[in-house]
Amino acid sequence: MAIEDVLRAGNYHLIDVREPLELEMDGHIEEAQNIPLGELEDRKQEITNLSGTKIFFCRSGNRSGKATEYFKSEGLTDVYNGGGYNDLRTVLDNL
């Protein structure tokens, strides 16, 4: 499923796995929750408890891919790699 379809379906949570300094330097998506990649394991229950699709994104899509694979390996099926910040921002702006 394309990211546009996931976003149009609604009922999702955007999770930005970049470091806080990256958000300050590069910008952020207002509705996104910032949980750096290094904190995901400690905050697993918090993320697991979110209803709907969890869309991870980062600067380029690499860390969000790791986050997506981690949660899939933990048994979650409602996770999606949203890719890089700039690309996701463009998609959101054009919906």
Predicted regions and their residues:
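Rhodanese-like catalytic fold shared by cysteine-dependent sulfurtransferases
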Residues: A2-Y12, V17-K54, S64-L95
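Conserved G/P- and acidic residue-centered "switch" motifs that form tight phosphate/ATP-binding loops
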Residues: G61
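Short, surface-exposed ligand- or partner-binding patches at beta-edge/loop junctions that are enriched
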Residues: F57-C58
